[in-house]
From Swiss-Prot:
Pfam families: RNA_pol_A_bac, RNA_pol_L
Native source species: Methanosarcina mazei (strain ATCC BAA-159 / DSM 3647 / Goe1 / Go1 / JCM 11833 / OCM 88)
Reaction equation(s) it catalyzes: RNA(n) + a ribonucleoside 5'-triphosphate = RNA(n+1) + diphosphate
Positions contributing to [3Fe-4S] cluster binding: C205, C208, C211
Location relative to the cell: Cytoplasm
Quaternary assembly: Part of the RNA polymerase complex.
Organism lineage string: Archaea, Methanobacteriati, Methanobacteriota, Stenosarchaea group, Methanomicrobia
GO annotations of cellular component type: cytoplasm; DNA-directed RNA polymerase complex
Descriptive protein name: DNA-directed RNA polymerase subunit Rpo3
Primary localization: cytoplasm
Highest taxon above the source species: Archaea
EC number: 2.7.7.6
Cofactors demanded by this protein: [3Fe-4S] cluster
Gene Ontology process terms (BP): DNA-templated transcription
Family that this chain belongs to: Belongs to the archaeal Rpo3/eukaryotic RPB3 RNA polymerase subunit family.
Length: 266
């Protein structure tokens, strides 16, 4: 049985698609891979040379670490897995970002200067700190590749979730309209022949079954496909939504190949 993917919505930061002919365990595996197993770049160390702002050094370091960075997974690798330096830190596993600012004014993520032009803050307008007249901030930040399972700052996937594809059948409807009034999604339309749901709207059903509960004659039944899922995901900007989904699939593929290699040795 071959897996099927039907893309419903796709933008740089978000996607919605139907994943069919897979188990719930597989769908959850894709979700977990997006959140925890796709490595991203995030600031790990901060060397502060001058900080006369109102924020403590630790507060600044925390804010910097949570700024999403555009990640090039083909160029960089997690430091612990780096074959070039053995985890000591080198251009293959880390990026340097510098910042020098003087008040008055607000320091933004766009003020970080990266040693690699490809690695930039995913959003240039994230405020870091406001500097008053005479206040300064001079620092160097070191970004490492890491996994979301180790820290939230390395989570590329946000708001990743899925639900079963709904199946709704309507038979012998008396067009009372109770189901339409109760539906929180507003997808049920009542016509002279009875209630109906447009095919394009069916995917919006939240499976709450409120329509089913208020129908006195049991004309409407809500069910779902066990092997088809509506998948919704957002990226923090480290990757595009498309690239994050592909990278998550590659992670699952790599784990499966690793398992097969181990089994072949038995």
């Amino acid at each position: 049985m071959t897996m099927e993917v039907d893309i419903l919505e796709l933008s740089d930061r978000s996607a919605k698609f139907v994943l069919s002919r897979v188990s719930m365990a597989f769908a959850n595996g894709v979700r977990r891979a997006m959140i925890a197993d796709v490595p991203t770049l995030a600031i790990e160390y901060v060397n502060l040379y001058d900080n006369t702002s109102v924020l403590y050094d630790e507060q600044l370091a925390l804010r910097l670490s949570l700024i999403p960075l555009v990640t090039d997974i083909e160029t960089y690798m997690p430091q612990a897995e780096c074959e070039v330096c053995g985890g000591e830190g080198c251009p293959a596993c880390e990026v340097s970002l510098t910042l020098s600012a003087e008040g008055p004014g607000t320091v933004y993520s766009r003020d970080l200067i990266s040693s690699d032009p490809k690695i930039q803050p995913a959003d240039p307008n994230i405020p870091i700190v406001e500097l008053k007249k005479g206040q300064k901030l001079v620092l160097e930040a070191i970004a490492h590749m890491g996994y979301g399972r180790d820290s939230v700052k390395w989570q590329a996937g946000v708001a990743c979730g899925y639900k079963n594809v709904p199946v709704i059948t309507i038979e012998n409807c008396d067009a009372c309209g109770h189901c339409a009034a109760e539906c929180p999604k507003g997808i049920i339309r009542v016509e002279e022949a009875g209630a109906r749901i447009a095919e394009d709207d069916l995917i919006k059903c939240s499976l709450c079954r409120l329509c089913e509960q208020v129908c006195d004659i049991n004309a409407i039944k809500v069910d779902f496909y066990e092997n088809a899922f509506v998948f919704t995901m957002e990226s923090d900007g480290s990757y595009t939504a498309k690239d994050l989904t592909i990278n998550a699939a590659n992670v699952i593929k790599g784990k499966a190949e690793e398992l097969l290699a181990i089994l072949d040795q038995l």
